[in-house]
Amino acid sequence: MMNEPTPKEIKETRLYAEWGLTDEEYHQIETILQREPNYTETGLFSVMWSEHCSYKNSKPVLKKFPTEGPQVLQGPGEGAGIVDIGDGLAVVFKAESHNHPSAVEPYEGAATGVGGIIRDIFSMGARPIALLDSLRFGELTDARTRYLFQEVVAGISGYGNCIGIPTVGGEIAFEPCYQGNPLVNAMCVGLIRHDEIQKGQAKGVGNSILYVGAKTGRDGIHGATFASEEFSEGEEQQRSAVQVGDPFMEKLLLEACLDLIKNHQDILIGIQDMGAAGLVSSSAEMASKAGSGLILELDKVPQRETQMSPYEMLLSESQERMLICVEKGAEQQVCELFQTYDLEAVAIGSVTDDGQYRVFHGGKIVADVPVDALAEEAPVYQKAYQEPERMRAFKKLAPFIPEITNSTELLKRLLQQPTIASKKSVYETYDSQVQTNTVVQPGSDAAVLRVRGTNKALAMTTDCNSRYLYLNPEIGGQIAVAEAARNIVASGAQPLAITDCLNYGSPDKPESFWELWTSADGIAAACRQLGTPVISGNVSLYNETDGQAIYPTPMIGMVGVIEDVSQITTQAFKQVDDLIYLIGETHADFNGSEIQKIQLGRIEGQLRSFDLKEEKANQELVLKAIQVGLVASAHDCAEGGVAVALAESAFANELGLQVTLPLKKEYLFAETQSRFILSVSPQHQEAFETLIGRKAQHIGKVTETGLVIHALDDVINCSTKEAKALWEDAIPCLMKQKA
């Protein structure tokens, strides 16, 4: 072990600054302790007060979100949020980002991101039933991007498939702004009975703190601080800040923890995942939530490396570890339970009532600080914000109108854009069927899983078009929530609530912080209008490479409930001669669109204001029509407009369509919001048109083959087979390029 600097040396050399603490924060710690903090204590404060653990820069933003509703059983503040779905059951879900680690070590970064979010779900007492992921990369023409993409996908499928939780959905987009800073956001969904909900608390004087799972190593030390800094190309050496995951160990940990929660409620007090900032974070949070204090004895912590310092043990982010609080005297029983799963459980401390966090090592006290100072009292900053220069420039631009010579060729080109193209090559590597509950496979608007023992099903999706947020963070934020809800509704489900991963640049730059601040207003407004509170989430700031920030990317994960499995709907046209309807009006919405990107090579301009009331009305009508059994298929209109939505609806069952739209050709590719493509059996035509009224435009019918779309001044005409092949092969073709 190295000789640790003395408190005086730490202060004089400003060592704390290397760990991310400012001078003001260091002085605040001195005031709290009434002395200079020692080496270990300085380390504890530096991670617990990092943005990643304390949300010190984003708390004022998060206050904007609605977090309550009649269906919400647990909002933000625990491992994950919980929503009631009736029948004594609830759904538990949360999303997490693992962006910085995945940029450095893409396979392990993505795999441990999946592992961490799964632990958050089962620490609540829920059985994880599904994984989704939201990924962002640079352009696939770049060799390093292809490597990152391949490894991240392999890491997600490697972990998810081994632990036996199906990866059922997600979304992937490619933009130059993610070149040096990919985004890897993972979402996990679990099921729980109301009477088995578990909280992460450590209370009751003398009760024991048990450490369970994998041994502690030196991996991931300062991972939380690493995630709270900007990225520079030189940082690819920071591999020790990336952890290595073991999905087989996690599978045992999952079963053991659920066994403990289900069958030993009498002795279990609290349970929490050791995630960011490892042991210090989980133990301090558990004590702080319960208003208790703690004593930890580090000599008892299972270690897989020799001569680890207290600092290293407390900050290690080794994977597959949980912290459990149990009744005094029950330690042996818990250890034996974990032994039956081949896992180690060790008592490493106890609960006190004095509110102090005391850590012993080698018979000496190495840290003695107030619990709340670590977990609750990090400073909160109201950052300065100002509208970016580009917004003023956008206001001066005339709206972009595409020039189209051949609509058929344009549709083919759009279908091959990586953001629109089929992601089949990705989701085929995921096991989406393990557990055998998956009813709607990846590739439709939302994934759907049935809830065993009931007639219900759950729909889930992740969504965000960051181009819209780049043009207008507030409207873009509204659209992200609205599109997620549209996907849930198109699958026949009632939207319940959201989780979010807020991926942004540095909060220290007023223009970046303005993006976070204003997009939160948009997200909050849409959540209120659509009745989907924010029940959990994660903030990932400092997503910049060499000073260039990513587009603002608030990934919205949404879950909805389908009361009766007979109402499950997919985007695929079902039968020849079914009628095709367009719900919602089409306007000249080309700014931020896929066609603008193709024709200009960039996106620019303003977004038209977005009518949330109309969005809500259209969603309610479509859901009603689905629930009364009048709809054969439903698909939301998104990137690429009506033309792409129609083509996608034809692909799954390789059918065709004959459609006539009273629009000029460019409008076939407009990305106006609040629109759906529905197909309806001719026998339901009258009932459907009576129910939907003027909102529905009957535009054509499903045919055996061929995509034929008539605009006022052009016709799209191509074979379904050819178009589908272009759409399916686009990403595999790009991946085969040589560097």
Swiss-Prot record:
The keyword rRNA-binding does not apply. GO terms for molecular function: ATP binding; magnesium ion binding; phosphoribosylformylglycinamidine synthase activity. ATP binds at Y55, K94, D500, G537. It catalyses: N(2)-formyl-N(1)-(5-phospho-beta-D-ribosyl)glycinamide + L-glutamine + ATP + H2O = 2-formamido-N(1)-(5-O-phospho-beta-D-ribosyl)acetamidine + L-glutamate + ADP + phosphate + H(+). One of its GO terms (cellular component) is cytoplasm. Pfam families: AIRS (PF00586), AIRS_C (PF02769), FGAR-AT_linker (PF18072). It comes from the Bacteria. Disulfide bonds: none annotated. Keywords: ATP-binding, Cytoplasm, Ligase, Magnesium, Metal-binding, Nucleotide-binding, Purine biosynthesis. Mg(2+) 2 binds at D120, D273. It is found in: Cytoplasm. Its EC number is 6.3.5.3. Mg(2+) 1 binds at E96, N538. Pathway: Purine metabolism; IMP biosynthesis via de novo pathway; 5-amino-1-(5-phospho-D-ribosyl)imidazole from N(2)-formyl-N(1)-(5-phospho-D-ribosyl)glycinamide: step 1/2. One of its GO terms (biological process) is 'de novo' IMP biosynthetic process. Monomer. Part of the FGAM synthase complex composed of 1 PurL, 1 PurQ and 2 PurS subunits. Belongs to the FGAMS family. This is Phosphoribosylformylglycinamidine synthase subunit PurL.
